[in-house]
Every structure is written in structure tokens, then in C-alpha cells.
Amino acid sequence: MNNVFVYCEVEGTTVAEVSQELLTKGRKLANQQGVELHAIVAGTGIKGQVEDQILPYGVDKLFVFDAEGLFPYTSAPHTDILVNLFKEEKPQIALMGATVIGRDLGPRVSSSLTSGLTADCTELEIGDYDDKKSGKHYEGLLYQIRPAFGGNIVATIVNPEHRPQMATVRSGVMQKSIYEGECKKEAVYPEVSKYVPAEDFVVKVLDHHVEAAKHNLKGSAIVVAGGYGVGSKEGFDQLFELAHLLHGEVGASRAAVDAGWVDHDRQIGQTGVTVHPKVYIACGISGQIQHIAGMQDSGIIISVNNDPDAPINKIADYVINGNVEDVVPKLIKYYKQNSK
């Protein structure tokens, strides 16, 4: 009762990386609250396959739901598993990835339990809250932090009265790590039929296709990112050339993607991917909160911008004050001369 829960996604018998990231964060939240970390995973043929991918992240108790029809994911059975289990266990916090599955499952579960959900959080913390209207004081609430109003401010959202406090987080926002402390590491295997009625399985997935990623933006050690200041699709061609020389990948701000200069799967930020490269070169990017949320944990940040007051310069380690179309060709020329 009153524990922290994480819903773990699987692709076949492989646990999603975002789930392991949330387990790491969930363990920290559970420690702060003095409660246990519990995890849920549902699929087909996963018993004996997923435990070693989940328990090492500090899980006290893992609920493994294994039955035909639970993979590939469909809405009804997974919703009933979580809703009925949460009614029994009464968690204080429930987390899941802000993925295609999480965006479908999270609202269904929170609506069924009349709790509430904050999507696409960039940080999760524990803190107190004073309700000025009622005069009530709440301790140990989940601070659900995310950009709001088009990314112009950062909002901290709390859910004082309803449980569980639910949040989704994008892949790459949190960092995963094996837990070195003490925890129970217990796995249980509930009977699926007690949680899921037979009619939930009326939908059958006939074909399941997973498309391979076109690039490794999230895993790249060097990212060259362009914003609206790059000026054109041709300008991005130069960024691709620079990234190739540096053995890196190209990313972009939302403004550049909306302009049609680069594909959406390269968008970095709150509505794109989160990256943690060793070096992040921001070219013509102003640095709205929404974008910074997706790259602020980079090792070294280099800003190329003709505006000395651009917000991104405040978090940059190095600033090159100049036009992208002047600076980038010089960088390319330099690296070509010195990489031979």
C-alpha cells in the first residue's frame, strides 16, 4: 500500500529503456518517501525473460502478467490489469513512459481511477504544498515538472487529493542505473484471468511491425543541432557535413522542423527526443525552455549565434558570436585540414 509503481513496456521479451530509466527514478522517489518500489510488466512468454531486466533497478516487487493476447499491446487488457491491480495495491505514485503505449494507457487508467495525469514531465521531485484556498498543508507530494504555455515557462503540477499521482516521462529524460542498495527483488505471477475479463481479448493483432531507427541521435556522443537561425534546408546540409566530420548526428529545434528543413525524428526538446551527448553544438538556436529541456544535460554546450543575448548562451560553456552561415563553413574547413 502507498508504494511507487512503474509500468514497464516490452517489445517481445525486451524491456524498454524508458522503463528502466523510470525504475531508477522511481527507486529514488520511493527512498524519499520510505516506501517500496513495485513494477508491472505484461506480455506473452515473458516469464523468466524479463526479471533480470527489471529487478536490478531497485525493484522490491515485480508483478509479471504473462498470457496469450498481452503482446502485442492492446488497450483493454493492459488497462484492466493496471486499474484492478491499483485498486488492490493503492499506490501513491504511478509512472510510465511517454510513448505511443503510455499515451494510450496512461489516460485510460487515470480516468478509470479518477486520479489525474501529467504528461511529458521533464523532472519528478518530492515536496510539500500549501493550498491557499483551503488552508491545507500537504507533505510528500509528487512534483510533476514540465514546460507549459508553449514552452515559455516551467510548471510544477501537484495532485493533492487523488491517488495515484500519475505521470509520463519521455525516453532519455531520466538516466538509468543499476541500484546498489538493499531491496527485496521479489517477482510474483498473478493469474491474469482474475484481472482481465475474456471480452478484453476480442481484438487480435494480426501483424506487428517495428521499423528500425534511421539514425542514432539519442546515443551519439556529438550532436550538431540547428534552429531557425540556420536559415534554410541548404544550411542544414552544412550541419550534416560538419556532423559527418565529427562522427556525430544532426538534431534540430522545433522551429526548424516546422519550417520543413529537417525530419521530425531529429527534433530535440519537449516534443522531440532528449539527448545527453558529450558535445552539443547549437547552431542558430535561440534556446526556448522546450528545447533546453531536451539537451540541458549535455557534457559541453557550444552555441553558435549572432544574438549575444540568446537564452541558450546562458547555459552554454562556449559561445561563438556570429552568423551560422559564416561560422559553420570555417569549422568544416578547419576539421578537414586537421583530421588528415
Could you say what each language-model-derived stretch is?
Residues 1-340:
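N-terminal glycine-rich FAD/FM-binding segment characteristic of electron-transfer flavoproteins
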